[in-house]
Amino acid sequence: MLAGALFLTACSHNSSLPPFTASGFAEDQGAVRIWRKDSGDNVHLLAVFSPWRSGDTTTREYRWQGDNLTLININVYSKPPVNIRARFDDRGDLSFMQRESDGEKQQLSNDQIDLYRYRADQIRQISDALRQGRVVLRQGRWHAMEQTVTTCEGQTIKPDLDSQAIAHIERRQSRSSVDVSVAWLEASEGSQLLLVANSDFCRWQPNEKTF
């Protein structure tokens, strides 16, 4: 897997990193896309999990001040949807926590909080490695005739994807009445198709000014 292999070489590409980055990786259960903004000691990160088959789309938003996690905001788009929110003070102590689903609010246990903090640290470490390794997420609308993509930034490009990835996109496109959205990763080691879907990825993609 391209993203996994890049962890081995991430540290050699750590100069002049941009403040706003998009990256991602594939795991067993689905694709994870990550948007991140670094401003001084502050880090704002959004991770979007899209399942391959079963499961629910999930967004996880985190904020750090230095090494201290200050916010966890998780939305699980199940039926009914679930929101999990926790805030921490500048010493790292918990100041607010809540789980809400179908109008019912519940407190979180200490074990649950510890698990969410662990997952936050885990995704931060993965994001650090992908960012330093310059693994870049690109996404946009596929144009089957030209095999090009109009990215969410408005550029029309031809992704450097292998024939297997192109064939997968074309199969999905043949079953859709609209141009499918595609997401892929680019790095010095090559490109990897990450996700294909009917939904419009650009409609909700974060941008640097408002993130």
Where do the PLM segments sit?
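Beta-strand/loop nucleic-acid-binding surfaces
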Residues: 155-173
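Structural detector for short beta-strands of small beta-barrel domains
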Residues: 128-150
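OB-fold/S1-family single-stranded nucleic acid-binding modules
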Residues: 187-211
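C-terminal motif of bacterial Sec signal peptides marking the signal peptidase cleavage site
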Residues: 7-10
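Flexible glycine-rich surface loops and low-complexity tracts that mediate binding to linear polymers
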Residues: 172-192
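Post-signal-peptide N-terminal segment of Sec-exported extracytoplasmic proteins
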Residues: 32-63
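Bacterial signal peptide processing site
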Residues: 12-14
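Surface-exposed, polar helix/loop patches in the mature regions of secreted/periplasmic/lumenal proteins
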Residues: 78-132
